[in-house]
Curated annotation (Swiss-Prot):
Cellular component terms (Gene Ontology): peroxisomal importomer complex; peroxisomal membrane
Naturally occurring in which organism (per UniProt): Xenopus laevis
Record's protein name: Peroxisome assembly protein 12-B
The protein's assembly and partners: Component of the PEX2-PEX10-PEX12 retrotranslocation channel.
Topology versus the membrane: Multi-pass membrane protein
Keyword Disulfide bond belongs to the record: no
Record GO biological process: protein import into peroxisome matrix; protein monoubiquitination
UniProt superkingdom: Eukaryota
First-listed, main subcellular location of the protein, grouped into a coarse class: membrane
Pfam family, one: Pex2_Pex12
Gene, per the UniProt record: pex12.L
Amino acid sequence: MAERGAHITTTSPLDDRPSIFEVVAQESLMAAARPALHHIVKVLAESNPARYGTLWRWFDELYTLLECLLQQHYLSWASASFSENFYGLKRVTLGKQVGQRNLARKEYWKSLLLLVLIPYLRIKLEKLVNSLREEEDYSIQNPTSFHKRCYKAILASYPFLKLGWEAWFLFYQLRYILWNGKHHSPLLRLAGVQLARLTMEDLRAMEKQEELTNTVSNVVSISQHIRSILKKALGAVTLSVSSSLSLGVFFLQFLDWWYSAENRETLKSLGNLPVPPPPIHFDLETYSPLLPKLRTVCPLCRKVRVNDTALGTSGYVFCYRCAYYYVKTHQRCPVSGYPTELQHLIKLYTPDG
């Protein structure tokens, strides 16, 4: 029994097939980079919404563009993604010719699209589903509308779609472990490549290629010279980004621990301070005619509030439906005018129900 499972943790010197621990480690590296950068941008946006609000709203698109530049650089230089190259792995075209080190053009573009596009679409789909669930919980959409039926179909099919996606990846990983499969991920199979370890010949070829790109011929045309400058600038940007990511790899583990649930509870217990006294309220009518005289009335619809919801940026309370639509449309508090996003809506539960 032990002999049959020995190949899971050990490899022969002649076998360049990486172990399951190597491929899982390189996948978790890029998976940890996005949440860490996302949290940094969130802190910056909350501290200065006017300056970093755009960066927060377009984080997914900017991160995808940055990742595209990074992966393009490593695929063209090392025939591997950033995380694969970090763990000493490379992508090999299935059935490649002897002596061919770089990826073929077809496999290169398929690898780049699958590395960049699939995570972006998955993040967008998860955000869409979470938004639809929130709108359905508070009955924001019209129940008789055509869009409502489409939303219900998406919400009903998403769990099965996610289950099938995860089962698809699990099947490939089990086949890679137990039956010596060539691919641990179906995305590699779709790209027409497989992972292998870097050899000394690969490292020497990468160094030689880097030297050739640094030496530019003196006799070139103007268009070639401009193209070379742009290529060098793009390479410098991607190299600086990759170097920064390499230095921050081990810092990501610290961030993962720092913002974990267990550590958050510990910090909360250490930082328990007495509740400050309530602020002194002046005559609200002198500076905000939008506020009603009765505290139980919503400032937007002028009716008794339903599903009390406060805005974390200003503290004013509205109906959930009124606050949701207003903040989604104007991105600010209707009373104070402070910049506000949907994540600043805080649902209140009163003792009287």
